[in-house]
Amino acid sequence: TCSGSITNDSYTLHCFSNAVHGGVDLERSLAKSCNSSFANIGLSLNLRDFSETCEELLFNRDLPIDFAGSGSRFSLSADSGKSEVMATAIGQGKTLVSPLHMALIVCAIQNDGVLMRPYLADRVENSDGGRVEQYEPSVYGRLMTEKEAKILRRYMKTVVEDGTASALKSDSYVAAGKTGSAEY
């Protein structure tokens, strides 16, 4: 149950605007960006499994790109204190992620868990419009199961329909997303 903040080992983490979310499941936690809920989840996780999952999502690895881009870092270990775990569970702490990396994860979610290799140009044409080179889409690999991707898509739609991104809600289109902060 979210009371607007969580304290553990003298470290207090607040929900945005000190919002009190009450009893929330994972979907509502994501929709409302409930820091208390994610801190509790982080404290309950096996840190090794948490780290492995992040590495499956390409943290601490080179991104599958053929152009300049920065990688992302996830750092938790058995020695990590509770405050570091809590901060990391809300995407803060020592975690660094580039916008490109987040876009790749979202693309995999939308593509049933499969990540395609990103490229900057579809084709190269000469001055007459003739095709000089055509680049073909290629699969990088699976970042998550189809079922996990489907659940995440539903959760991200809830963020727009009844969560922190509700300003994007429209009868003209369907949108999904996740809000976030660069620092807490």
What are these regions (language model features)?
Residues 1-184:
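Beta-lactam-recognizing serine transpeptidase/beta-lactamase-like catalytic domain environment
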